């Protein structure tokens, strides 16, 4: 062990806000399927609480022994539309309540997997789950929902895209006392991954093991501090600096993942290489882009800087860890990033620029507040645009958007905690109604046929 390396890591944690964003245990619920909904829910509760009973305790032990902050302990489960589909129930809200109760019992921060995978079409269970989302998110505290509406191999399910615009509006309406907060726990995906440790989009894929440990790291502050030391130097040096820094951050993630795996007796899955910001100053992806040379994020050059950042993070992370996965890249959630918030307030960052940025980074339009009177068809069209970016570029994209009831452009919506605050952003007011109402499927792109 090199003493300088140890001191450097301590400095990264104490001064540069390096932390483990989440330890997420994935749990398969396939053995909980039962035609009797009540029995299924008992099995689900018992399986989750038994499997993850030591998750929070082990997380705290590792935090204390290694001195590494672990911000969240989470659980993801098999998409509930698959589990509940065996029942004859007309609503899956009770399943969401069971998940919430299990999360409370465990003392975890979030539980993901109130999900449906409908990229090619909907089963009966998928339709019921999607229709249950608004009420489920309104009456639970820790449950997160996600719906996958497209993938490169199948194209985009435009019926589901149309429906999700309505669902997001209903969710906002049912949680209007919290400015539409329910929508912060709902993600619409294209090319969703099965091993994502981050919320609100985590679910435990059917191709995964019985139980698995996935870890998400966070280190925008560390990358920014490293780049401050190479100001004025070429992009070659910038890329190399980011790569080396990402290596160090990911090494720490792998250490925690392996230790959690060993103590819990659960296999290690992946480390997600994503740079996840927080609302704290100095823990911002936007500030990294500005350190690269932009006056404010959103100006010309933003997409190129973000593309390089994303690629360099992956190159460094892949070298540091034998199993990487999840979303892996740079997150650009507006409400969770102090630099992004500032850029929106200044007027240098708009929705269209954010859309362009999603072409080259991890996810999509994330934690963006829009006026509460935005039509459902416009939200559906936003989802379609993001899904198209993901499907054509063979990458994960997503929409987590909050139509804040009673709010208009320029208002500030406060969510608190890691979710931060979001300035309400202007949306193109021209109608997409006829587009959204067409339905059907947008076919898979020609380059998806690889067999």
Swiss-Prot record:
Q: Which InterPro entries match?
A: UPF0210
CDD domains cross-referenced by the UniProt entry: RNR_PFL_like_DUF711
Highest taxon of the source? Bacteria
Q: HAMAP family per the record?
A: UPF0210
- What is its quaternary makeup? Homodimer.
Family, per entry = Belongs to the UPF0210 family.
Q: What is this protein called?
A: UPF0210 protein CLL_A1718
Species of origin reads Clostridium botulinum (strain Eklund 17B / Type B)
